[in-house]
């Protein structure tokens, strides 16, 4: 059974970048928003150009994050996510998928770019829920431990539940996160 604790499971190097900046609105997020808007307006040639810029900016941001983690923890290694690498990725992995479905590929690339320590994982989750509510299930998430359950809302942290009896009494064992929407999506809590 899964064990509660902070150091029980493997963690990506990107999540250990303790000195990497936390961004409220990053340049690559702005570009991804612009690319999505252009896709929705059927301006695909403009959207493609902006998506390429967004991916390049996202790669640079991830490179900064990884270099921070490498430095912070004294790990020997390097990270090359340069503009050339990003362009090669776009040309060889993204372009054909974008041509087939511009909006879907834009949203998938945005989701991938938000991984890491820059504070954008929550935005990726918001996009996931927004797209699902709009009937656009471009991003498929799965829970390998329970294929029918995926959180509909953000949970209380384990320290909040363990140290505050009021939270435990009000919310029980936390299973409501799989069945109840947040208040702005029709939930009651």
What label would you give each PLM region?
Residues 1-189:
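Acidic/polar-rich alpha-helix caps and helix-coil junctions
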């Amino acid at each position: 059974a899964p064990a509660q604790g902070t150091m029980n499971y493997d963690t990506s190097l990107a999540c250990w970048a303790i000195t990497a900046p936390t961004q409220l609105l990053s340049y690559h997020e702005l570009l991804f928003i612009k690319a999505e808007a252009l896709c929705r307006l059927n301006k695909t040639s403009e959207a493609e150009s902006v998506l390429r810029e967004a991916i390049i900016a996202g790669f640079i941001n991830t490179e900064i994050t990884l270099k921070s983690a490498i430095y912070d923890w004294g790990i020997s290694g390097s990270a090359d996510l340069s503009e050339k690498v990003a362009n090669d990725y776009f040309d060889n992995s993204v372009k054909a998928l974008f041509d087939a479905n511009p909006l879907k590929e834009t949203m998938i690339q945005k989701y991938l770019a938000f991984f890491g320590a820059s504070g954008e994982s929550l935005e990726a989750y918001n996009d996931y829920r927004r797209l699902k509510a709009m009937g656009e299930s471009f991003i498929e998430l799965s829970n390998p431990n329970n294929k029918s359950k995926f959180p509909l809302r953000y949970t209380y942290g384990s320290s909040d539940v363990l140290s505050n009896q009021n939270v435990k009494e009000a919310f029980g064992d936390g299973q409501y996160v799989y069945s109840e929407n947040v208040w702005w999506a029709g939930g009651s809590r």
